[in-house]
């Protein structure tokens, strides 16, 4: 019997049943109808959607129809900055950049240094804020321009958020947040108040533009509890409901359902050097057989293999990915060769990303929302 999985904004444990999780949260499956509507306006479908990394949503169809009527909307996502960024963190951001480019809309990106300070007993506030600035480099490195990307570091850019957060907080009862997030009598009040701030950004574009400006939030599905609450109270506060687009977690190199910051070998970080990347991929769990002879005779299982999972992330060519899949299943492709192919793809991506990341180092303040509003 499979271990029962646990998914909260702060913890993912066990092998996640994504269909069951979607049903538990009450989200909707991403169907061909929504994908076709997206393609109608974007002109194409991003591989992350085409290959099923994004699989559930709330009102994606509604915000696309809103777009079709020529009405304004925005994108919103965020990051809890507690350490360096790994590839799994970047999946929603890559789609975020694509959506911004295709639809020409602004992006609001929240760095929740306060949340990470509240959540981690060992975390100093200054450390969380330092990581917010460091992680911002990874977002900027994706190619955003200051007119399209608005960074919000909670402890530094609170002024435009706080009036909205106050209204949100007044609508949320202790019983509601306790039931939604599993808070207990020992939960500190910072963490109890924090959902008001994450919800507030969903309403911020409407305040700044002075007219209804709903947001679409691409993020991992563990963030759904925040935005369920946001949708519950939005209209009573005079704001449009936020729409969401949910991704699965990126499989850990060790074979678990999700990469873990507590195990550096489970993930590839954007600051890893080539030697480290090579070692991590070489040591990665695979769906291969114990010996090359067995692999050739019986074939491998790419469906449980993080190496194949990463090929799906980093290879934009559907025919190439399909060839890897069938070559593994047939035994024609051995794990060592497959890992070497993946290493070359990731090495190239990380090298280019690191160069862009360093160029962004003295530009963070130009992207911060508060610097544009002052």
From Swiss-Prot:
* Subcellular localization(s) per the UniProt record: Cytoplasm
The record's section on Gene3D superfamilies has: HUPs (3.40.50.620), Tyrosyl-Transfer RNA Synthetase (1.10.240.10)
Q: Name a Pfam family for this protein.
A: tRNA-synt_1b
Identification of the protein by name? Tryptophan--tRNA ligase
GO CC, one annotated term: cytoplasm
* Keywords carried by this UniProt record: Aminoacyl-tRNA synthetase, ATP-binding, Cytoplasm, Ligase, Nucleotide-binding, Protein biosynthesis
Q: What is its EC number?
A: 6.1.1.2
Top EC category: ligase
């Amino acid at each position: 019997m499979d271990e029962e999985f646990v998914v909260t904004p702060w913890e993912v444990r066990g092998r996640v049943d994504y269909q069951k999780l979607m049903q538990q949260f009450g989200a909707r499956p991403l169907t061909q109808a929504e994908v076709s509507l997206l393609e109608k306006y974007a002109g194409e479908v991003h591989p992350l959607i085409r290959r099923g990394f994004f699989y559930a949503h709330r009102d994606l169809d509604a915000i696309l129809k809103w777009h079709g009527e020529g009405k304004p909307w925005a994108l919103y996502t965020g990051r809890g900055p507690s350490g360096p960024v790994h590839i799994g963190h970047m999946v929603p951001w890559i789609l975020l950049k694509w959506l911004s480019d295709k639809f020409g809309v602004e992006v609001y990106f929240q760095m929740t240094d306060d949340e990470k300070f509240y959540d981690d007993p060992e975390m100093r506030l200054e450390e969380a804020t330092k990581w917010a600035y460091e992680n911002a480099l990874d977002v900027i490195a994706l190619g955003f321009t200051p007119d399209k990307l608005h960074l919000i570091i909670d402890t530094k850019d609170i002024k435009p958020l706080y009036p909205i957060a106050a209204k949100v907080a007044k609508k949320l009862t202790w019983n509601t947040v306790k039931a939604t997030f599993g808070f207990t009598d020992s939960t500190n009040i910072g963490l109890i108040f924090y959902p008001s701030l994450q919800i507030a950004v969903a309403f911020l574009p409407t305040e700044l533009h002075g007219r209804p400006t709903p947001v679409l939030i691409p993020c991992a599905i563990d963030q759904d509890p925040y935005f369920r609450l946001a949708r519950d109270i939005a209209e009573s506060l005079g704001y449009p409901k936020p729409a969401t687009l949910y991704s699965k977690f990126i499989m850990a190199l060790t074979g678990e359902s999700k990469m873990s910051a507590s195990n550096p070998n489970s993930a590839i970080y954007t600051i890893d050097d080539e030697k480290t990347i090579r070692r991590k991929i070489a040591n990665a769990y695979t769906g291969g057989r114990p010996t090359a002879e067995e692999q050739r005779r019986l074939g491998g299982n790419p469906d449980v293999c993080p190496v194949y999972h990463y090929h799906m992330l980093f290879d934009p060519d559907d025919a190439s990915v399909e060839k890897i899949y069938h070559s593994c299943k047939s035994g024609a492709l051995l794990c060592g060769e497959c890992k070497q192919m993946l290493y070359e793809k990731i090495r190239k991506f990380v090298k280019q990303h690191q160069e862009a990341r360093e160029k962004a180092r003295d530009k963070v303040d130009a992207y911060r929302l508060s610097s544009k509003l002052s």
